[in-house]
Amino acid sequence: MSKIVKIIGREIIDSRGNPTVEAEVHLEGGFVGMAAAPSGASTGSREALELRDGDKSRFLGKGVTKAVAAVNGPIAQALIGKDAKDQAGIDKIMIDLDGTENKSKFGANAILAVSLANAKAAAAAKGMPLYEHIAELNGTPGKYSMPVPMMNIINGGEHADNNVDIQEFMIQPVGAKTVKEAIRMGSEVFHHLAKVLKAKGMNTAVGDEGGYAPNLGSNAEALAVIAEAVKAAGYELGKDITLAMDCAASEFYKDGKYVLAGEGNKAFTSEEFTHFLEELTKQYPIVSIEDGLDESDWDGFAYQTKVLGDKIQLVGDDLFVTNTKILKEGIEKGIANSILIKFNQIGSLTETLAAIKMAKDAGYTAVISHRSGETEDATIADLAVGTAAGQIKTGSMSRSDRVAKYNQLIRIEEALGEKAPYNGRKEIKGQA
């Protein structure tokens, strides 16, 4: 009943109006799985390759017809007749057939769409929800938790057209008892933030991930307006709600210095920027910082981990790119203490699960994440619950491409009840 009989690839549109790959995997018995690949804006240099056509006359060169052709051609031919329940086997066939280190022949966008669609089809054939199937693939059947959301309510950097250097300013409703309550708390703060910004005469247009993208006097001012909104919503900052940032520091790393336009084009060394961040953590309850330095600045990261690593969560995104080879090296060198997990950085479900396992085995946390270019596909919600990862980053409280994931978490929590606890602050490295 779980034998693959047909695979279909197609070009669809993501949340930025760019094409992406969607795949359908059809099994005997009429079971179907469908999934779409996301796409990033600030990307790590060692990510698996997202295959684009490069034909400037079509979608400004961003078409994905080559990746779709790979799905409908060689990938489909290789997988028809195979058992969808063998996720590792399915992914290995595609990876071996591609034959490149970074999936550049078929594109990680092609391989990932099929990989996720296959998992959904197999779950359907087994008569179980996707999160339950993922827990079995992960070797942790029946072990679930609801993730603490990191809600990106002010967008800067590559995610917005404003003068804020730091890419994401996030809130974490750690004081909630359930994910549904956490989402309500986040929504209330989001709406109060709009009122705060409007009262200051600031723009309330939103960025790629649904957060506001105002022009602010400094990066610290973003934290100040969020603190004001948290208070206005009736919550206590540091107790009910904590703060997190994604610096995406590679985006403002120039000639060995960190150049912040929002701080008057001031240039910082690795050590100076680490202490700039440290000062912010003293002023505000920031409990997680992602990509606090450039992805290649490993000496700087070692210093940053030494200074901040026993106090807060230091998340590697561009640093580790969901790649077990790079993560292993980081663990050995004591770099950071958490990894951001993005399916499309590595390009298959099996490799994603391997990265989560390696992180957890080393005492690192794993934060499941969306990309800035998303679709209505909500697979990351099931991944977060099915691996009991504990944290999820999926944008703000607006834009259907972000809210789709929150709504899926609400549905899953309703189905699982007490089997999937919401552990709040305990999930964040250094906060237990």
Curated annotation (Swiss-Prot):
PROSITE patterns: ENOLASE
Residues at which Mg(2+) 2 binds: 42
Disulfide bond positions: none
Binding site for (2R)-2-phosphoglycerate: 41, 159, 167-168, 209, 342, 371-372, 393
Activity across pH: Optimum pH is 8.1.
Modification N6-(2-hydroxyisobutyryl)lysine occurs at: 342
Residue numbers of N6-acetyllysine PTMs: 257
GO molecular function, a single term: identical protein binding
SMART domains in alphabetical order: Enolase_C, Enolase_N
Family that this chain belongs to: Belongs to the enolase family.
HAMAP family cross-referenced by the UniProt entry: Enolase
This protein's name: Enolase
